[in-house]
């Protein structure tokens, strides 16, 4: 059972914003479809005064569809063009006859400025909790829904910063054959084409907007503007790695022609080479690419994400999610080299099964996959069977983290070892960061200052297979869950940090929890950051094993330095039948593996 007060607050927050209310009516103001209807939307030739029942009588905008509650067998056919209104879908199909939203081949451009907005509270993303976030497609309490396009031919494009698809309290939703991109990416980029003396010449990829004034360059676009500098990476396409540096503060920039610039160094020599790309963004996490909240049975199949803003696909308190044949990478013939500000696939407090198979992940500034829960600090015990807990990280708070019936573990902040359990019987949201939990049983007597709790009801199993991870300056997979984890037959290419990282902490990101059953099998690791597999919980005063029952078998490591596996504070570890090489020569296991 979900916390009704927190759920209501979430829904009210999602309805907050400047979008015209007539375009996004409440459920009680909508008309119930009888089912098995086909409607058409044509932004170029349609008219919202039409019946919408045929291509020749299509609606012009999403507004008429937003006045319906869809039913089994309904199909909404959306023709390409410019969409000034978001699709705000309510309805319920059946498994045999789902509600189908069919985006026809072509470019579907969602315009900036008039889209539906809300204030969802998003894990690891909440730098701007009160800033409305635009949404192109929103599924609200929808069930048995199919979003579909033609692979390689149907593109959903954002003109400005927005969430592509936001779903909350949805069930049995699939996304099939869709491409997602920005007309004007919020990641600034340029490609160095020539270096001569103290000057570099560079090309800015199509679609990335900028201005040059007084020797400085400013990136801008609908909903986003910042001066070149700050957080940046240099990507070397020849090696597929991030290397080099560039400081625009020591340069004078001139525009030679549209999309062409020169960069003259006031001191020193050019620090980049022809073929290298400069990637630049601000660090304010104010949005994400996709947001899936309190939803279950979600399938992504044969989709391509070319670019998304902020944290990537965020699944928060969702159940049973599968990504199959998903590719996250720029368009093949584009000069762009980045597809995501932060993580590709981010899972916070999920349960059921997370399956990632046959995917290509990367081209981001952070991890390809991150699976974790959240540690909340115990700050008060107002009654023997009550505790007050607090979200501690400034980018993670405000969401419904507990419900009656959820089981919690009490965890030592020093050792990260759980020492007691309890069950939630009541939840009271005190403010955006503090929650009072009523528990079925009294609190243990040995709670120490700064100890934390984890919602262990919401912990998923994870199976990642046949997936490529590349063009990432950080980690490949971050995995902390007590349910079974299997990573098999994946390929990790030159990640800047460990390819697989298992941590758990109660002092930094507060990302939980313990690992109890993990197998890493038959994967290939090529020149990744070391240790390539690192299992090191952040326990300030370790006492006993935090993680246990981990098997690393049958993997192939091509090493840069020599450390393939580093493990601490973990019991029941098996590292066997792995192959280690460096510079083409085999390395014995005892030199490549460090377990203590």
Region spans (language model):
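Bacterial N-terminal signal peptides
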Residues: 7-17
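Acidic Gly/Asp/Thr-rich repetitive segments characteristic of extracellular carbohydrate-active
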Residues: 26, 43-102, 135-136
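The right-handed parallel beta-helix/beta-solenoid scaffold, focusing on the short coil/turn
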Residues: 37, 74, 85, 97-99, ...
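Extracellular beta-strand-rich solenoid/capping regions of secreted or surface-exposed proteins
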Residues: 68, 84-102, 108-146, 157-176, ...
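Short glycine/acidic-rich loop motifs that flank beta-strands on beta-rich extracellular proteins
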Residues: 85-88, 112, 158-164, 184-189, ...
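Ser/Thr/Gly-rich low-complexity blocks that favor extended beta-strand/coil architectures
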Residues: 182-183, 207-256, 397-432
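Small/polar beta-strand repeat architecture
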Residues: 237-285, 418-421, 425-463, 470
